[in-house]
Amino acid sequence: MARTKQTACKSTGRKAPRKQLATKAAHKSAPAMGGVKKPHCYRPGTVALHEIHRYQKSTELLICKLPFQRLVREIAQDFKTDLRFQSSAVMALQEASEAYLVGLFEDTNLCAIHAKRVSIMPKDIQLTRRIRGERA
């Protein structure tokens, strides 16, 4: 093969643009053709914080009424059969029990934070109840 003379070409001082691969070109043009949009994903913990703020603002009951009512009737049957409850009595029980549970979880969270953790554990609830004097 005969040698050919190379001619110098003018340099612009930057790299020549690369040619796109066929897969990249197809990938970039796919959403424009009406592909399904991926749902927005929040960072871990963001949704939990939104829920915390939402439930702290609200005053509605968090436990469903009918399952709670069934639980009350089931527990009451152990003491006496054929007991009847006024709806206001069940609501008062539910308000009191939810207030107790919210307070218990607040104190339990403080115990977990004191132990340099962010997740509550059964031992935190046990410690909280022991400090409160509910369980010896």
Swiss-Prot record:
Chain positions with N6,N6,N6-trimethyllysine modification: 5
N6-glutaryllysine: residues bearing it: 15, 19, 24, 28, 57, 80, 116, 123
One GO MF term attached to the UniProt entry: DNA binding
Residues with the Phosphoserine modification: 11, 29, 58
Record PTM N6-(2-hydroxyisobutyryl)lysine, positions in chain: 5, 10, 15, 19, 24, 28, 37, 57, 65, 80, 123
N6,N6-dimethyllysine modifications at: 5
Record's keyword terms, sorted: Acetylation, ADP-ribosylation, Chromosome, DNA-binding, Hydroxylation, Methylation, Nucleosome core, Nucleus, Phosphoprotein, Ubl conjugation
Location(s) in or outside the cell: Nucleus; Chromosome
InterPro entries (alphabetical): Histone-fold, Histone_H2A/H2B/H3, Histone_H3/CENP-A
PTM-bearing positions, type Asymmetric dimethylarginine: 3, 18
Domain of life, source organism: Eukaryota
5-glutamyl dopamine PTM positions: 6
Residue(s) carrying 5-glutamyl serotonin: 6
Region span, Disordered: 1-39
PTM text: Acetylation is generally linked to gene activation. Acetylation on Lys-19 (H3K18ac) and Lys-24 (H3K24ac) favors methylation at Arg-18 (H3R17me). Acetylation at Lys-123 (H3K122ac) by EP300/p300 plays a central role in chromatin structure: localizes at the surface of the histone octamer and stimulates transcription, possibly by promoting nucleosome instability.
Major location (coarse): nucleus
Compositionally biased residues, Polar residues: 1-10
PTM-bearing positions, type N6-lactoyllysine: 10, 15, 19, 24, 28, 57, 80
The protein's role, per its UniProt record: Core component of nucleosome. Nucleosomes wrap and compact DNA into chromatin, limiting DNA accessibility to the cellular machineries which require DNA as a template. Histones thereby play a central role in transcription regulation, DNA repair, DNA replication and chromosomal stability. DNA accessibility is regulated via a complex set of post-translational modifications of histones, also called histone code, and nucleosome remodeling.
Descriptive protein name: Histone H3.3C
Species whose genome carries this gene: Cairina moschata
